[in-house]
């Protein structure tokens, strides 16, 4: 009999999940191809490093910001970020703690939540990094991966939905205008919209 994972065990399941990472990387690659500028957030430094190594092929520039770097190194990385030309495609990979108050890079228009978070303030803070005026920015999109097979993360997702609704976000269709489906019991249309109705 298998047991339901909790705590660090639950995070380990998604942190070291190649299929899940492949899904995220495919979405990031499509995002860059569509001319968007994504930031991918994860809770773990090793996860950020692993994803950044595999994602660098998809953009002209990839910049990794993690809490493992000293202050001097982080300043150099921020300088590198600010030096990226508008004509260059860019992927920013970071640990969530580094995108707190004071971080400002208006070009970002797409957020990838590579590990689950909960708490209205955290969601508002992360999404707030995208809500900056920038020439040519038409909208902002959040990719939120629903780990519904793990009860802990399913509850966290429900909490995030409430936060998204509070700050005015809507359920999104894919970039080609079609509802995106997943090979699971619920696709994004039925699963998320059911939650959305529950919040009304």
Per-range role (PLM):
Residues 39, 49-50, 59-100, 122:
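Conserved helicase ATPase core of P-loop NTP-dependent helicases/translocases
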Residues 110, 117-142, 160-161:
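Conserved SF2 helicase motif VI
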Residues 92-94, 100-116, 125, 141-144:
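A short beta-strand element within the Helicase C-terminal
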Residues 1-54:
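Conserved interdomain hinge at the start of the Helicase C-terminal
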Residues 45-47, 70, 98-100, 116-120, ...:
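Conserved nucleotide-binding/hydrolysis micro-motifs of P-loop NTPases
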Residues 30-33, 56, 82-87, 103-105:
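Conserved catalytic network of the ASCE P-loop NTPase/AAA+ motor domain
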Residues 3, 9, 134-199:
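C-terminal helicase lobe
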């Amino acid at each position: 009999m298998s047991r339901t994972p909790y705590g660090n065990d639950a995070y380990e399941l998604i942190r070291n999940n190649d299929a899940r990472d492949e899904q995220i990387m495919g979405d990031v690659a499509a995002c860059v191809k569509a001319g968007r500028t994504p930031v991918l957030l994860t809770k773990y430094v090793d996860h950020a490093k692993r994803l950044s190594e595999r994602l660098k092929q998809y953009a002209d520039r990839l910049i990794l910001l993690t809490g493992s770097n000293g202050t001097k190194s982080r300043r150099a990385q921020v300088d590198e970020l600010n030096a990226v030309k508008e004509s260059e495609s860019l992927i920013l990979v970071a640990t969530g703690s580094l995108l707190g108050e004071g971080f400002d890079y208006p070009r970002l228009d797409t957020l990838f939540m590579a590990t689950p978070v909960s708490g209205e303030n955290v969601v508002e803070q992360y999404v707030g990094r995208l809500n900056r005026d920038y020439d040519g920015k038409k909208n902002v999109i959040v990719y939120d991966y629903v780990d519904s097979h793990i009860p802990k993360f399913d509850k966290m997702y429900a909490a995030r939905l409430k936060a998204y609704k509070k700050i005015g976000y809507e359920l999104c269709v894919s970039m080609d205008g079609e509802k995106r489906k997943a090979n699971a019991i619920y696709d994004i249309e039925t699963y998320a919209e059911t939650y959305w109705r529950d919040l009304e």
